[in-house]
Design a protein with these regions (language model features):
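C-terminal transmembrane helix-loop-helix hairpin of multi-pass membrane proteins
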Residues: 14, 147-209
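Alpha-helical transmembrane segments in multi-pass membrane proteins
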Residues: 15-20, 38, 42, 46, ...
């Protein structure tokens, strides 16, 4: 049954799930080599789906949207790597003016889902901290706890990415032909949104002085 389920999956889904897990790890758990930034993640996912130009383009614009979020403290923020991976992977199989903007919207929404999953994982990780042991805490040696947290983060990133790609492709496939704008207007719409995000960032930093 499991083999049949795998055979019915889109051929690139497992590959995207693996990449989503690695990008999720780079966010905080392992490395922080910045490959989880939208621009880099977009290029990697674009390569994985066979359209690096698409990946770089979506990643570059998403970078403008994500720059306004400063992931500090325990606040919840959209996960840029998840948003980018889902947006690029959802857009890749489709053509037409609506493919990128609709996939972009799906990616932004799923970035919020990714952010919520990070918060849930932080709660799980708190149960692994030796100093915070209580009746509900899990009892593992520190080294094992660290490995468990890394494995859970990888699985979280993979699961969120795969479900986002599946849901996004199903949604876009049913509504893409209703998209009313031509390609030039669609691109302009995304860039205007990015410009607004950059304006908010500049305002928060004090603007031009």
């Amino acid at each position: 049954a499991a083999q049949g389920l795998i055979q019915r999956m889109p051929p690139d889904l497992l590959r995207l799930g693996l990449l989503g897990g690695l990008l999720g790890l780079d966010g905080t758990a392992v490395g922080q080599f910045m490959i989880s930034r939208p621009l880099v993640a977009g290029a990697l996912v674009g390569w994985a789906v066979g359209d690096m130009e698409l990946g770089i383009g979506i990643g570059a614009v998403l970078e403008l949207y994500i720059l306004v979020s400063f992931p500090t403290g325990g606040a919840r923020f959209p996960e840029g790597a998840t948003a980018t991976a889902v947006a690029v992977a959802v857009a890749a199989p489709f053509s037409g003016a609506g493919a990128v903007p609709l996939s972009f919207a799906v990616g932004l929404v799923w970035g919020q889902v990714g952010g919520a999953s990070v918060n849930a994982q932080r709660h799980f990780n708190s149960l692994l901290i030796p100093e915070a042991r209580s009746n509900t805490a899990l009892s593992f040696p520190p080294g094992i706890s660290h490995l468990i947290a890394i494995a859970v983060d990888f699985l979280r990133g993979s699961a969120v990415t795969m479900t986002g790609v599946l849901a996004g492709r199903l949604l876009i496939g049913s509504v893409i032909y209703w998209w009313p704008l031509p390609s030039s207007a669609s691109t302009g719409l995304l860039l205007v949104g990015g410009a607004v995000s950059v304006g908010v960032l500049l305002h928060d930093l004090g603007g031009f002085r």
